[in-house]
């Protein structure tokens, strides 16, 4: 499994940046040295989610222009000393960076980190191509609605055209609502797996804790009182190759839904 990972999605608003931040924090909590790269030039948010917006001195554009090296532009996280961010510029455009620029930046950083995680812009334009250029593995974030699944499927097709095998692409289902699934009002994990024909690596239930965390600049992964932080730890452990069952992502689900979810997962395994 590659250690350069891009987190992408077919559309905006599915929680991609939040997942990037929390995955980075979860890996760092497990002792990994992690660099997060915000590749969403002009629309950067990763620094805000991490609570680092006031600590930025240099951005990726400064690196591309030769003003500083990639390492000189990094911002160290306040709470996790083995987590770093390479920020995006708010005033630049995606056309100011090329796929080769991204490859060069990652090539210089990778010897110093266990994992590099790139937050890709949503969609399939230039910024997306920049973000996936140096990646060895892809996490596609979607929510359990048909429009989001359709957009994710389109991105997966592009990734396959870029040479990514199915083994290098995994799906994260975000904002999953088990009570709606139980009533037949939301797609199941089984539905999504069969539609996208890819393995699901994590399910993140809908949680108010994530909204609160985004507004405070402290990722929910760092909140020991939030049960949803365990979901991101599960994801981080799977990224490291640990065999954490997908069922473990539902430890926060009410007891009344357990039988329903077990049925979904038994179908998923048979599929």
UniProtKB/Swiss-Prot annotation:
Supply the Pfam families for this chain: CbiA
Decide whether keyword Cell cycle is in the record.
yes
Membrane topology of the entry? Peripheral membrane protein
Q: Which GO terms describe its molecular function?
A: ATP binding; ATP hydrolysis activity
What domain of life is recorded for the organism?
Bacteria
Against InterPro entries, the record matches this protein to: CobQ/CobB/MinD/ParA_Nub-bd_dom, MinD, MinD_FleN, P-loop_NTPase, ParA/MinD_ATPase
Q: What is this protein called?
A: Septum site-determining protein MinD
Native species of this protein? Thermotoga maritima (strain ATCC 43589 / DSM 3109 / JCM 10099 / NBRC 100826 / MSB8)
């Amino acid at each position: 499994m590659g250690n350069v990972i891009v987190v992408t999605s077919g559309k905006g608003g599915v929680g991609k940046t939040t997942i990037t931040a929390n995955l980075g924090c979860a890996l760092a909590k497990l002792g990994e040295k992690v660099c997060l790269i915000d590749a969403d030039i002009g629309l950067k948010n990763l620094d805000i989610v991490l609570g680092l917006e006031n600590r930025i001195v240099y951005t990726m554009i400064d690196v591309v222009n030769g003003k500083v090296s990639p390492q000189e532009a990094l911002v160290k996280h306040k709470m996790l000393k083995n987590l770093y961010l390479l920020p995006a510029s708010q005033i630049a455009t995606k056309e100011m960076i090329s796929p080769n620029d991204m490859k060069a930046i990652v090539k210089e950083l990778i010897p110093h980190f266990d994992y590099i995680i790139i937050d890709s812009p949503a969609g399939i334009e230039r910024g997306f191509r920049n973000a996936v250029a140096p990646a060895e593995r892809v996490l596609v974030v979607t929510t359990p609605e048909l429009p989001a699944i359709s957009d994710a499927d389109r991105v997966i097709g592009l990734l396959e055209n870029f040479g990514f095998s199915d083994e290098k692409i995994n799906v994260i289902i975000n904002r999953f609502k088990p009570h709606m699934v139980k009533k037949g009002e939301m797609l199941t994990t089984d539905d999504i797996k069969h539609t996208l024909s890819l393995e699901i690596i994590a399910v993140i239930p809908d949680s108010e804790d994530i909204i609160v965390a985004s507004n405070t600049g402290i990722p929910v992964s760092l909140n020991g009182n939030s049960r949803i932080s365990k979901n991101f730890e599960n994801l981080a452990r799977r990224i490291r190759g640990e065999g954490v069952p997908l069922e473990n992502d539902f430890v926060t689900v009410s007891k009344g839904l357990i039988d329903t979810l077990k049925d979904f997962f038994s179908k998923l395994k048979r599929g």
